[in-house]
C-alpha cells in the first residue's frame, strides 16, 4: 500500500463516522436507543463481508469507511447505558464503552499475531453478528419509553435492569425521576431557584403537558444545555489534541527504537493491555473520585509524560528504553481519564429531549479532530519531526488542566436535573 492509501485507511473511518452522525441523532429519538445500537452494528457486518470477498486495496479502504459509519453508534451506546444506569454507578458503566473498545483492540492484536488474514476476518464478522443478536435481548431505555408515552413498558424496563418487581417502590421512584427529567417546565423551575427534587405532582404524574418542540429549538432555548454542550465539546477537543491518535500511529517506530529486541506485535499487545487496565481502573475511580479531579490529575500526568517523551526524542538525554516507559505512561494516564470521561459527561450532561443530539455533536467533534490530527499532523511530522509535535500535545494537556479546573462541573452521583442546576448557577456567576 502507498503512503496515501495507508493514510486513507486510518482516517476514512472518521469521515464515515462524521457522515453517519446526523442519522444516529435522528434514529436515537425516532427508533429508540436499543434499536439504534443494533442498526449501527450492521455497517461492521457489511464491512467484514466485503473484506471477505475482495483483495482490492480500494475496496478494503471503502469498507473501512463503511465501518466508520458504524462507529458513529458509539454515541448511541453511551446514551443507552447512561439511561439504564443508576446515578451512583452511571460513570463506571458509561466508561465501560471505552473498556470494551480496548478489550477489542487487545483481542484483535492477539489474533493478528496467531491467525491467518482470512481467519481474523471471519472472527470479526462472527462477533459483529453476535453483537446485534445480544443487544436484541436487552430492554429499551426506560427514558425513551417514557418519552414515547409507554409508562408500563418503562416500568418493566426499570424492573429488568434493577432486578426488582415492577410494582416495587424503587421502580415507582425511578419513574417519578424520569417524569421530572421530561417535565418541560424543569429548566424554568431551576432558573427560578426552586428545589429540583421530585414533587408530589410529578409522583402523581401531573407534570405539565409536553409541547412539540424540535431538538434544535429546545437546545436553542435551554441555557443549561447550551452551556453543557460548550463544556463537553471543549473537553472532547482538547483530549483528542493530546495526541493519542498520533501516538498510536507512530508507536511502532518509537518502540523499534526504544526496544529493538521486542517484536512490534508484542509491543502492541502490551499497549492494549495498558489501555484495558487504565480504562477498568477508571471505571472504579470515576464514581469514587469524581469526573473533575480524576480528569485534572490524569490530564496533568499524561501531559508530563508526552512532554518528557518530546525532550527525550529531541535531546536523547536517557537510554532508549526510557521512551517506551514514557509511551506506556502516557497511554495509561490518558486512558485513565481523558479517553473515557468525555464520553461519560457527553451522556450525562443533557436533558432527555436533547441528549441524543448533544451527544452526537460532541462525538462529531471527536471525529473531526481525529481526522485533522491524522492528516495535518502527519504532514507536520515530515516537516518538523515528532518532538515539536509532542510539545504541542503537552500544551493542549496544560490547557485542559486549567480549563477543567475552572469550568468542568463535578457530576458524580447527580441526577440530570441537579446537573442542569450546576450549569444555571455557573451562568449566573458569569453574569455578575
What label would you give each PLM region?
Residues 168-183:
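Short, well-structured alpha-helical segments
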